[in-house]
Structures are given as structure tokens and as C-alpha cells.
């Protein structure tokens, strides 16, 4: 049985030997996620727990033999148990990681690099989420290694409250970006009154 674990092995940009060619993720519906879909906010009935965050995220995926999103979903499926950052921001981190991975990767040595820099508006349920003025600087390396393949994820997410106009993070059930986390702990509640906003339940 494959076991998810953190190990010492690192993603290296260069190899003193002949570097192994890195395969691009396959362009297959099951494996590849197109750019995320945003649902614009029309009307929000309550602004009590809504905050703008300037977020930047970077995910480096390292695998000498290429990788599929099936593996990434499997790794991220245990995110709640292995997340080492501020737990009041775990929902925000999940969204940023999911959006970053839904973008286009840039090759960098042995790595595929996904970056995201956006201003997003998040809303938390029942006064949960980060404290007023709280910021996040989170970085972690997560690796998957078994007898046949190795995949390493280096995740960095920064978030700070800001007052410039952002875009509402809303769940569109038809969006492939949203489906990345659909079988995980990130859940949303939507009512008819707030149908264009989303609550991150943590």
C-alpha cells in the first residue's frame, strides 16, 4: 500500500549527471485542468466576514518522469493532516493552491512551476478564518515516493489583507478548478440570497 510521507529527497534544478527529461502533464480531460472559472459577485447581503486578500502562490512540481493530476489529487487529499501553516487560513491556502495548479506551468530545470498572484475576496462562515489584520507566509515541501515514481511539491503561499478591488472567490460546480478539491474537506454553503458568494468552512 502506498503511503504518503515527507522524505528528505529534494527537487533539484540541476543534475551533475545527464538530466532526465521532464514530461509535460498530458492534455487529457481527466488529468489536466483548464483555467479556473470565476463567478462575478452581483449582490452580497452581508459583508460581516468578507475580506480582501492580496495573495500570491507558487507550486513547484518535480517529477523526473512526468506526473498526472491523479497523483497530485492523491497527495493533496491528505492536506488537512500534513498542513503545517496557520489553520485559520487553511481554506484560503487550498483555494490558492488549487487555482495555481489550474494555470499554465513554466518549466524551470527539473521542475514545473505554477504561479498565482491575485487579489481575491474571501468570506468565512461564523467569524472563522484569519483574525483581523492577520497575514500568512506559508511554505512546505510534500513528496510522494514509491517503487515506481517520485513526485515532489514545493508550496509557497503568501496572503495579506488589502483594500484594492478584488474578485470574489465563488464555487462554480462546473469548473474543473473547483473539482480539484471536490472530494476534500473544502466545502461551500450557498443560499439563494448569497448565491454569488461562497463561504469557506474550516
Curated annotation (Swiss-Prot):
Pfam families: Rhabdo_M2. A motif (PPXY motif) lies at residues 35-38. Keywords: Host cytoplasm, Host membrane, Host-virus interaction, Membrane, Phosphoprotein, Viral budding, Viral budding via the host ESCRT complexes, Viral envelope protein, Viral matrix protein, Viral release from host cell, Virion. The keyword Disulfide bond does not apply. GO terms for cellular component: host cell cytoplasm; host cell endomembrane system; membrane; viral envelope; virion membrane. It comes from the Viruses. GO terms for molecular function: structural constituent of virion. It is found in: Virion membrane; Host endomembrane system; Host cytoplasm. It is a peripheral membrane protein. Residues 115-151 are annotated as: Essential for glycoprotein binding. The record marks 95 as: Involved in the inhibition of stress granules formation and contributes therefore to virulence. One of its GO terms (biological process) is viral budding via host ESCRT complex. Late-budding domains (L domains) are short sequence motifs essential for viral particle budding. They recruit proteins of the host ESCRT machinery (Endosomal Sorting Complex Required for Transport) or ESCRT-associated proteins. Matrix protein contains one L domain: a PPXY motif which potentially interacts with the WW domain 3 of NEDD4 E3 ubiquitin ligase (Potential). Belongs to the lyssavirus matrix protein family. Homomultimer. Interacts with nucleoprotein and with the cytoplasmic domain of glycoprotein. Interacts with host ATP6V1A; this interaction plays an important role in virion uncoating after viral entry. Most abundant protein in the virion. Plays a major role in assembly, budding and uncoating of virion after membrane fusion. Completely covers the ribonucleoprotein coil and keep it in condensed bullet-shaped form. Inhibits viral transcription and stimulates replication. Plays a major role in early induction of TRAIL-mediated apoptosis in infected neurons. Inhibits the integrated stress response (ISR) in the infected cell by blocking the formation of stress granules. This is Matrix protein. It comes from Rabies virus (strain CVS-11) (RABV).
Amino acid at each position: 500500500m502506498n503511503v504518503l510521507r515527507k522524505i528528505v529527497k529534494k527537487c533539484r534544478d540541476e543534475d551533475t549527471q545527464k538530466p532526465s527529461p521532464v514530461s509535460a502533464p498530458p492534455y487529457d480531460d481527466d488529468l489536466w485542468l483548464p483555467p479556473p472559472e470565476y463567478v462575478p459577485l452581483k449582490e452580497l447581503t452581508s459583508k460581516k466576514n468578507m475580506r480582501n486578500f492580496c495573495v500570491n502562490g507558487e507550486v513547484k512540481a518535480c517529477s523526473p518522469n512526468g506526473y498526472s493530476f491523479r497523483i497530485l489529487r492523491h497527495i493533496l487529499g491528505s492536506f488537512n493532516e500534513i498542513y503545517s501553516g496557520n489553520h485559520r487560513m487553511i481554506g484560503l491556502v487550498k483555494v490558492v493552491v488549487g487555482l495555481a495548479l489550474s494555470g499554465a506551468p513554466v518549466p524551470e530545470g527539473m521542475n514545473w512551476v505554477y504561479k498565482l498572484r491575485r487579489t481575491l475576496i474571501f468570506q468565512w462562515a461564523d467569524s472563522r478564518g484569519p483574525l483581523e489584520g492577520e497575514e500568512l507566509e506559508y511554505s512546505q515541501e510534500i513528496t510522494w515516493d514509491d517503487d515506481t515514481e517520485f513526485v515532489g511539491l514545493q508550496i509557497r503561499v503568501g496572503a495579506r489583507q488589502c483594500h484594492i478591488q478584488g474578485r470574489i472567490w465563488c464555487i462554480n460546480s462546473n469548473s474543473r478548478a473547483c473539482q480539484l478539491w471536490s472530494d476534500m474537506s473544502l466545502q461551500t454553503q450557498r443560499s439563494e440570497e448569497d448565491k454569488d458568494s461562497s463561504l469557506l468552512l474550516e
